[in-house]
């Protein structure tokens, strides 16, 4: 809290600790306010291992939520990689994206429902992880021509979008392909399936590295561009 107007925090309060710091791109991200008044977020393999309210928690690679007073935290959806995307449709269903060819997941039943029993892992619902850059000059070293660094998963919930997009199109960034892709999220039984809908934005600028795309207060799509030729931690390929 800034108490004297100098734009610096004079009062700092640690809500809880326990986040792994061994790898910066595997830590927590995507904090956002949920429909249920909890704060949601994602974490990668750096994990969380700490005690809150007298209860020990240890989880990683998926979606969590916590109360704003830090009195409780819950791990909700188990994904299979560093999780960099998080989104909700208007029904409040939870979706996400991860590294390594996993651009869209549906959370499904929260892990808290199982009361300590074996938890169900979320499944990737995309028909294909392929993306569609408009230049051959892209840099990837572990997965090729696909969402190796999928991040963001915002839905087109604004009336500013054409009707065919509303609450159906999800925007997943592919910084290693210099693009923002989209998937059509389609109801299927008790879950969803996702159909690749090509690129929503793509650039031939090799430094264009979108890392999140969200619907802004004006109803339009806002894009955060890291703008860096190297977006990953991986070494320069030898071939």
Language-model segments: which ranges?
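Beta-propeller domains with acidic blade repeats across secreted/periplasmic ectodomains
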Residues: 1-239
